[in-house]
């Protein structure tokens, strides 16, 4: 997820039980042009493994070159994003946009598989719209092109994130007797109960969680504990949320520098304190303050209201 699954956030998910993580998706053209922001997204760390680098683009040659550049960072997996529905990506033929040209999608995948000595995986959607839900055939063809796993979001590109994710076609992919690679489901899993129900009902090999982890890195341990015991872990306390936000801020400052670290962290605070009635009195300071020391004190004040600034 762009601006989410970066090095400042990933350690929080790893500590909370995430089994496999991916970088933010990285533009193939940005990598080829050696754009600083794209290159920085290649940063991965030993403590994060296993981890995949995810790339996107619309041109086969550029994607092959980007795959070779990415492979030099030695991720455990190289992932191709054929699922991003955002207009500026999809309408240029990248991300979910390539679902309008399946032969090109297959050719691009084969080029990337042949270009690197890493397992290649794919993240995609059911189709471009309700009339092109060809995911069962597409998954089979991508497997034949050499991918080692596929993650499927249960919506079309046209749906964006509206309505409910439809996992029935994900199950159809899993039940296809020709499919020999792992099939992971994605979409709307934000509780342990949903994770267990979807795994059992749709027979997937695993579950990919995206939006459900934003401001909630605890979801991974919560789900795994529920799978193992049928019981819920305690919900994170206010102090837990403050500590997670503090660590996220510190990691952001370390990786992005003072200015960007402060500014780009602002989008995350509300997610950590969602549902907390007294958060609104702290929000303005968190999204306007530039001094990390004051930000740290502001976070502490959320769990210790009587502590002076």
Question: What are these regions, as identified by a protein language model?
Answer:
Residues 24-27, 82-84, 154-156, 202-221:
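Glycine-rich phosphate-binding active-site loops on the catalytic face of alpha/beta enzymes
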Residues 21-23, 51-55, 78, 120-124, ...:
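Hydrophobic faces of well-ordered beta-strands that scaffold small-molecule active sites
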Residues 300-309:
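Single conserved hydrophobic/aromatic residue that forms the stacking wall/gate
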Residues 3-76:
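Glycine-rich, positively charged N-terminal anion/phosphate-binding segment
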Residues 61-72, 132-140, 189-209, 216-218:
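Catalytic cores of alpha/beta
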Residues 13, 24, 53, 80, ...:
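Conserved, mostly hydrophobic/aromatic
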Residues 162, 216-232:
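C-terminal helical cap(s) of enzyme catalytic domains, especially alpha/beta-barrels
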Residues 64-78, 82-94, 103-181:
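Alpha/beta enzyme core
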């Amino acid at each position: 997820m762009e601006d989410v699954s970066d090095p400042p956030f990933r350690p929080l998910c790893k500590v909370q039980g995430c089994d496999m993580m991916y970088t933010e998706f990285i533009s193939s053209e940005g990598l080829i042009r050696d754009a600083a922001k794209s290159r920085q997204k290649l940063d991965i760390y030993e403590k994060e493994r296993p981890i995949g680098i995810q790339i996107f683009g619309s041109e086969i040659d550029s994607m092959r070159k980007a795959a070779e550049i990415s492979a030099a960072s030695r991720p455990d997996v190289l992932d191709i994003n054929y699922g991003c529905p955002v207009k500026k990506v999809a309408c240029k033929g990248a991300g979910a946009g390539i679902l309008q040209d399946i032969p090109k999608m297959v050719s691009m995948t084969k080029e990337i598989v042949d270009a690197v000595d890493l397992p290649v995986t794919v993240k995609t959607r059911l189709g471009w719209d309700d009339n092109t839900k060809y995911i069962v055939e597409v998954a089979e063809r991508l497997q034949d092109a050499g991918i080692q796993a596929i993650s499927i979001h249960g919506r079309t590109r046209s749906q964006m994130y509206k309505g409910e994710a439809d996992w029935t076609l994900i199950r159809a992919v899993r039940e296809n007797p020709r499919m020999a690679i792992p099939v992971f489901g994605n979409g709307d899993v934000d509780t342990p109960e949903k994770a267990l129900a979807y795994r059992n009902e749709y027979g997937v090999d695993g579950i990919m969680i995206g939006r459900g982890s934003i401001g909630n890195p605890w979801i991974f341990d919560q789900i795994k504990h529920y799978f193992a015991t049928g019981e819920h872990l305690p919900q994170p306390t206010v102090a837990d949320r403050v500590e997670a936000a503090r660590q996220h801020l510190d990691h952001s400052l370390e990786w992005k520098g003072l200015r960007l670290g402060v500014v780009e962290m602002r989008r995350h605070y509300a997610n950590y304190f969602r549902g907390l009635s007294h958060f609104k009195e702290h929000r303005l300071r968190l999204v306007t303050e530039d001094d990390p020391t004051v930000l740290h004190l502001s976070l502490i004040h959320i769990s210790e209201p009587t502590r002076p600034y």
